[in-house]
Design a protein with these regions (language model features):
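Short coil/loop residues immediately preceding or within conserved phosphate-binding loops
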Residues: 6, 12, 25-27, 43-45, ...
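Acidic, gly/ser/pro-rich intrinsically disordered tails
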Residues: 1-5, 15-23, 36-41, 56, ...
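Disulfide-stabilized netrin-like
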Residues: 41-54
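Beta-rich strand-turn-strand
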Residues: 51-87
Length: 111
């Protein structure tokens, strides 16, 4: 079975660097605008995790507001919020990441 997703959107929080020097990984949030057939749009939110040396090297270029495109494996996550309500969220184990614009570039262009 093939499980692959490719989406582009805006990073919702600054990257968190984790792991060790030998096994680094990063986590970040991604908001993707979903366009519906009737002209409405709504956001989809994903938690993202990326492993390896490439993750460590791109971490310094990604911050809240950066527009990126990611490809990876989609997973659903069940969690309980602070009010005790059950929710299902989605996460992406990122295999490939492309910077579409840096936050500084967006600000200079007035995006």
């Amino acid at each position: 079975m093939i499980n692959n997703i490719t989406v582009s959107g805006n990073v919702t929080r600054d990257v968190e660097k984790r792991g060790t020097v030998d096994k680094p990984y990063i986590t970040f949030g991604l908001a993707v605008t979903e366009y519906k057939g009737n002209g409405e749009k709504s956001p989809m939110f994903y938690s993202c995790i990326m492993f390896g040396k490439r993750a460590a090297s791109v971490a310094d270029y990604i911050q809240k507001g950066t527009k990126i495109c990611v490809s990876g494996q989609l997973a659903s996550d069940n969690y309980t919020d602070k009010n005790g309500l059950e929710h299902t969220g989605f996460s992406i184990k990122v295999n490939d990441l492309e910077l579409m614009s840096a936050k500084r570039e967006q600000e200079s262009r007035g995006w």
